[in-house]
């Protein structure tokens, strides 16, 4: 039991701390294991805790303000590169994209106030909004052109009254969705977690609401946020096959529907967590993926033979390469977040 718990912890822990205790056997080297179903439950539980920890969540979000299918479909069309699979691989600074749907307040026929809340779950700390755009749906009488003023309101000192930071003027001549790129004042407000906009019709008296906010036309802000960090590309190691007992990568798939997370995780449907298992003879210690040259293997074998009294037990089968998980999900404010969670997928295993 203890051996299997240590194994599962090792699978999800950073590779830099995989150092076996002196005189002890590595927990991934074929010691006593749990029953297959118990091991599966343990790995699923650890996968859930790992995702929540890396999203800075104490528990899975509860959707108090569900988004309609029509609004979700419209919003996703404006995301750049919605993930089709679970893996991404690049060397860019890590970024995420957030879609925040508006809460409407203090509105009249000719003026609409929109409030947007940006959670700090995933983007806590050094987040910086790089781009932000307002998407809103306008319904106008035919053959008319109206001027729309968009005001960016920010909180004053000590979070007191809202004050005008900047404003934009738009000529709107057709019904439908319209996009307004937002400048640094609005981006700074998004970075701080809250943005308030006022949309005002200039020189016109509307007979009915021009800015629609129903289920299918709910305004939203799409923001691109820089989080920091880089992904590294590593070569693949050896996959477990048949009855092999050597260090290898064992495939393990986490199905979000199976664990009851499909309501708040939009994409993907699951991901390949994988883990490392198998024995590590001393002569292949320190060889990532057991893929070093024959000459290196010979040198390590000679080193092992000259180590008096040394037995196989000081080297562990550990992850040597990981990849991020690309996730599209609802946060606790019902915003849609697209982000890459680093080090979630074990790509290769080797002996420490």
From Swiss-Prot:
GO terms for cellular component: extracellular region; extracellular space. Keywords: Cleavage on pair of basic residues, Disulfide bond, Glycoprotein, Growth factor, Hormone, Secreted, Signal. Glycans are attached at residues 110, 143, 161. CDD domains: TGF_beta_INHBC_E (cd19406). This is Inhibin beta C chain. Belongs to the TGF-beta family. Residues 19-236 form a propeptide. The gene is INHBC.
């Amino acid at each position: 039991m203890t051996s299997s718990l240590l194994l599962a912890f090792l699978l999800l822990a950073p590779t830099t701390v995989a150092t076996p205790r002196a005189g002890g056997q590595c927990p991934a080297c074929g010691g006593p294991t749990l029953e297959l179903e118990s091991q599966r439950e343990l790995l699923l539980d650890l996968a859930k805790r790992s995702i929540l920890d890396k999203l800075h969540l104490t528990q899975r979000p509860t959707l108090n303000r569900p988004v309609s299918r029509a609004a979700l479909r419209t919003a996703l069309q404006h995301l750049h590169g919605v993930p089709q699979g679970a893996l991404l691989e690049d060397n860019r600074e890590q970024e995420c994209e957030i879609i925040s749907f508006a809460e409407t307040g203090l509105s009249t026929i000719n003026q609409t106030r929109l409030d947007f809340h940006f959670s700090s779950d995933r983007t806590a700390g050094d987040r910086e909004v790089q781009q932000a755009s307002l998407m809103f749906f306008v319904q106008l009488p035919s053959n008319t052109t109206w001027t729309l003023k968009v005001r960016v309101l920010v909180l004053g000192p000590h979070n007191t009254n809202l004050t005008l930071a900047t404003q934009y003027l738009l000529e709107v001549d057709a019904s439908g969705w319209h996009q307004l790129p937002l400048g640094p004042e609005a981006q700074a407000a998004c970075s701080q977690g809250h943005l308030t906009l006022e949309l005002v019709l200039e020189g016109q008296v509307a007979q009915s609401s021009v800015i629609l906010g129903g289920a299918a036309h709910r305004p939203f802000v799409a923001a691109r946020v820089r989080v920091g960090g880089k992904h590294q590309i590593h070569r693949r190691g050896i996959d477990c096959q048949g009855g092999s007992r050597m260090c290898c990568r064992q495939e393990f798939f986490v199905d979000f529907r199976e664990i009851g997370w499909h309501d708040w995780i939009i994409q993907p449907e699951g991901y390949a967590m994988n883990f490392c298992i198998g024995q590590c003879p001393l002569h292949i210690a320190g060889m990532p993926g057991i893929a070093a040259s024959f000459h290196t293997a010979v040198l390590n074998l000679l080193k092992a033979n000259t180590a008096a009294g040394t037995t196989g037990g000081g080297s562990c089968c550990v992850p040597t390469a990981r990849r991020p998980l690309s996730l599209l999900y609802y946060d606790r404010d019902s915003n849609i977040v697209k982000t890459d969670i680093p080090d979630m997928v074990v790509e290769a295993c080797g002996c420490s």
